[in-house]
């Protein structure tokens, strides 16, 4: 379980004080896939960095399995938007994936086993010996996902990971995330600016307000577990959920709801 309790983040410098996140509280249950959406610049990335121990909050706390997060916890992995910067171009794909595993007390044989399993999970076994620059953008992001999977995390934090790929690749990667979530039971917190993506991927959508960020709404996504790009996206219920989230984000832009967060079941 991932708990965010009264989280607050203030940036200070050059005589300015900017409150990015204000008294933010929510829970992500173990094995849940939750999407975070909100207006542009609302503090989604700041929140994710605080949750992952990459940025110290000004107030409040984040708990993973009941333990306070004060630095990057061993049970957590990240996938970022800029996959080109997270992969080392001079290292082969398999070596990129293995690199974080060297921090663990694992034999070389075990590391290779985890790398092979992760590559198979993202359908990139044949690319193990390639360099990242030889792969398409979508394939590079699959490598980044494989590296996170090989780490065997309890929680996977994903910060707009598909924003830089084309529409077809994005659809394929969305289906990959849903499949990996079902197969591995990982807790996933997925940040996106795309409303359709949030509704398609998530079992729950958390809508954030404009900065300073609070929870505008938590919405249960009551779509079937089995989803596909053709049928799910044209379903009447998908359209209803998408419209509802869109309306909430528009309200957030106007400043509505910040004093009275709501939950929709």
Language-model segments: which ranges?
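Short helical segment in ABC ATPase nucleotide-binding domains corresponding to the A-loop/adjacent helical element
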Residues: 92-102, 112, 116, 220
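Conserved ABC transporter NBD signature motif
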Residues: 60-72
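Conserved ABC ATPase "signature" region
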Residues: 102, 109-127, 179
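Helix-to-loop junction immediately C-terminal to a conserved catalytic motif
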Residues: 52
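The feature captures the beta-strand-to-loop junction immediately N-terminal to the Walker
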Residues: 37-39
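Catalytic Walker B motif of ABC-type/P-loop ATPase nucleotide-binding domains
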Residues: 156-159
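Conserved signature/switch motifs of ABC ATPase nucleotide-binding domains
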Residues: 130-133, 151
């Amino acid at each position: 379980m991932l708990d965010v309790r009264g989280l607050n983040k203030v940036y200070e410098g050059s005589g300015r004080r900017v409150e990015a996140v204000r008294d933010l509280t929510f829970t992500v249950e173990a094995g849940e896939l939750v999407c975070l959406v909100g207006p542009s610049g609302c503090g989604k990335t700041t929140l994710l960095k605080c949750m992952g121990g990459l940025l110290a909050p000004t107030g409040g706390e984040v708990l993973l399995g009941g333990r306070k997060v004060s630095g990057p916890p061993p049970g957590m992995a990240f996938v970022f938007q800029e996959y080109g910067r997270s992969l080392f171009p001079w290292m082969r794909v398999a070596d990129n994936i293995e690199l974080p595993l060297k921090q663990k007390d694992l034999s070389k044989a075990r590391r290779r086993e985890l790398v092979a399993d992760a590559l198979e999970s993202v359908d990139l076994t044949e690319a193990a010996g390639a360099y990242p620059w030889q792969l398409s953008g979508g394939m590079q992001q699959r490598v980044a996902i494989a590296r996170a999977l090989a780490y065997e995390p309890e929680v996977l934090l994903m910060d707009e990971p598909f924003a830089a790929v084309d529409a077809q690749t994005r659809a394929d990667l969305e289906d990959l995330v849903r499949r990996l979530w079902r197969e591995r039971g990982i807790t996933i917190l997925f940040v996106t600016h795309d409303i359709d993506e949030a509704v398609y991927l998530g079992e729950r959508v958390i809508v954030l307000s404009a900065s300073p960020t609070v929870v505008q709404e938590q919405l249960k996504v009551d779509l079937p577990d089995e989803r596909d790009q053709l049928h799910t996206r044209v379903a009447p219920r998908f359209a209803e959920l998408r419209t509802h989230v869109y309306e909430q984000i528009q309200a957030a832009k106007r400043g509505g709801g910040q004093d009275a967060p709501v939950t929709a079941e």
